[in-house]
């Protein structure tokens, strides 16, 4: 088989912004180089919707899906501060593919496929992206002050309890289930 490796990089040009170094809590500047076309393609392979669609087709072919089955993939949009990485970068290309795949699954597999746009989360990978640790630390503080902060488990529990992933799912104008509300 082929091994693909995803990268969190911009497309087009290098991205430089302020960054919070979590090792020593210092603020400095950090840069990320632009991705090559091969890195963009590999990131779409890893983080796009191809595997999701293959799994859903396999479940349909095995006749193990109920008539009213639905499926959901998680996504993230974030602040304009992070757009060069998340929205316009390699992961943005993968997320666009994921969103297109949701439509394909709905039409071709016959299963309601949804995208849940979730709140920001600091991971080992995202902590290496300029501005993200600083942005997330401020975001978490504001969410806590406004009593809207929730952990990952609470967010997904709310997704299934409040957003109703059935026929009457609550979505925005793009058809996305917004958990970053």
Range-by-range predicted roles:
Residues 1:
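Active-site loop/lid in soluble adenylation, ligation, and acyl-transfer enzymes
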Residues 47, 104, 108-116, 133-181:
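C-terminal helical subdomain
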């Amino acid at each position: 088989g082929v091994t693909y490796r995803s990268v969190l990089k911009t497309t087009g040009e290098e991205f430089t912004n302020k960054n919070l170094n979590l090792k020593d809590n210092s603020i400095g500047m950090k840069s990320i180089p632009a991705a090559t076309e091969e890195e963009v393609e590999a990131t779409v392979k890893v983080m796009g919707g191809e595997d999701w669609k293959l799994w859903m087709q396999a479940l349909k072919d095995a006749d193990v899906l109920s008539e009213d089955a639905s499926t959901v993939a998680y996504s993230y949009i974030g602040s304009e501060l992070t757009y060069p990485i998340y929205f316009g970068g390699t992961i943005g290309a993968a997320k666009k593919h994921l969103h297109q795949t949701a439509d394909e699954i709905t039409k071709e597999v016959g299963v309601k496929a949804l995208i849940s746009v979730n709140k920001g989360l600091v991971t080992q990978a995202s902590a290496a992206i300029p501005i993200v640790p600083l942005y997330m630390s401020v975001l978490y503080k504001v969410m806590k002050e406004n009593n809207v902060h929730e952990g990952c488990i609470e967010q997904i529990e709310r997704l299934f309890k409040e957003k109703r992933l059935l026929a009457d799912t609550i979505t925005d104008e793009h058809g996305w289930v917004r958990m970053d509300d």
